[in-house]
């Protein structure tokens, strides 16, 4: 949130001179107009993508959706009104429009900061408390937190901006100017800058550091776990074939149909290639799991009937409808079974941990991009706020204008961060821009043997 008034709206700084050259006016108007258009277009793409692509409807993306709403408000109203104010050199829309613009601008800006805090805390608890927090992490609870973030932003700024003049008994804002009346004192501006920018940034950076450390610890634990499963690594992947189970004492091979999974109730498992999962975005991966560490079906794409071991003769052939089993010997030259299931369990545990780690890294990458963009675009202006508290005339007017506009540019950059760090957003943006998205038609395209991927048909 912009915690001070811009140069043209500050009582301590003269407004933009009406005599600016036509080329300067044209350059400023075209540049800011393009930025506003890019901001509106990018954030509308986020909203439409969330609507048409069900894979994006994850809890984490609900926070991004709220952030996009705040950025859309800034791109639609704040950018254009501020540009008009700068180019005209005075506020010509009246006091009511001035107060409404400031209230909308500050509420949306503060909501952006609150949503960034929510995203940071959500990532932090998801990584540090995966079991207890994920059980409570529902869309309804996320919507409640988002609603509270907007409510707090509204309560903090809207009443004070709209009704301060009535509380003190007079309006002290100079004629032809538009700024927040109670922020005309530098010490108050300094306090709001500390509370609205520096404190949230400190909290977000601390949380991100904790997330980074926890993710690194998990990576080391996973490496140690994978290093201890030498029996499981020699047999290759177990995601595309069924093993026969030998007897407990190394007896001859069991007949077809008597495998280690025949004792379980029959069910159809959907196979997902592990390499393919690594290529999926964080949102789609999260939709494949119901809890922390739970891996989607990754064993076999077969339906095994229940077989009675006593009723089945050793020489009886399996029915035609039953799939053939593929025996894959271990290093010792015999099928995995009995004691061999223990390394297989470690292999599956390592795969689940790897899946969870990849997902968390993708989410952390999105968070880091958004946080970095926020710091880079908001820090210059808030540094100038601190400087002006102790030296009113030390900051040139042009720097004030650039710094204030740079805060708005953050709303332009955020959708780019989503696209760069999230494959689902990137692909959906591309299809929407090329007019190739049709959410009503889907087709199944096997990307690899043993895997099924659902993609939208691409037609305008």
Curated annotation (Swiss-Prot):
Self-association state and partner proteins as the record states: Interacts with GPRASP2. Interacts with TMEM147.
Chain's role: The muscarinic acetylcholine receptor mediates various cellular responses, including inhibition of adenylate cyclase, breakdown of phosphoinositides and modulation of potassium channels through the action of G proteins. Primary transducing effect is Pi turnover.
UniProt keywords, alphabetically: Cell membrane, Disulfide bond, G-protein coupled receptor, Glycoprotein, Membrane, Phosphoprotein, Postsynaptic cell membrane, Receptor, Synapse, Transducer, Transmembrane, Transmembrane helix
Modified residues (Phosphothreonine): 230, 455
Organism: Mus musculus
Gene3D superfamilies (UniProt xref): Rhodopsin 7-helix transmembrane proteins (1.20.1070.10)
Topology term for the membrane: Multi-pass membrane protein
Compartment(s) of residence: Cell membrane; Postsynaptic cell membrane
Topological domains annotated Cytoplasmic: 49-62, 122-142, 210-366, 421-460
Entries under Pfam families matching the protein: 7tm_1 (PF00001)
Family note: Belongs to the G-protein coupled receptor 1 family. Muscarinic acetylcholine receptor subfamily. CHRM1 sub-subfamily.
Transmembrane segments annotated in the record for this chain: 23-48, 63-84, 96-121, 143-164, 186-209, 367-390, 398-420
Segments for region (Disordered): 225-257, 274-297, 310-351
Composition bias type Low complexity, residue spans: 238-257
Glycosylation sites noted in the Swiss-Prot or TrEMBL record: 2, 12
Topological domain spans for side Extracellular: 1-22, 85-95, 165-185, 391-397
Protein name: Muscarinic acetylcholine receptor M1
